[in-house]
Amino acid sequence: MQFKMERPGQVEVGQIVDITEGKLPSSFYYTIEPAVAMSGNYRLAERLIARQGKVIDVEETPRGFFVTCEFNE
């Protein structure tokens, strides 16, 4: 799962991060705590069960920083 991060250095590859879930009327979104990065929106079928993940990549692009996490599900 990919998250958008606004500033560099808030998480590192290999770090275990806590995730919180937000609910919209027809989808869910996830935040790396404490409000470090936010995911896009996911449908019910894509909903995460895990609340901890491991950072496997941090990529800098012209649009910002993108954090990729893996979850044991």
Regions found by a protein language model. Name each.
Residues 24-36:
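Short, Lys/Arg- and Gly-enriched loop/turn segments at beta-strand edges
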Residues 58-64:
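Short, conserved beta-turn/loop elements at beta-strand boundaries and strand-helix junctions
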Residues 42-52:
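Short coil-to-beta-strand transition motifs
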Residues 14-17:
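Loop/turn positions that initiate beta-strands
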Residues 1-7:
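Short alpha-helix capping/helix-loop boundary micro-motifs
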Residues 64-73:
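Short solvent-exposed strand/turn elements
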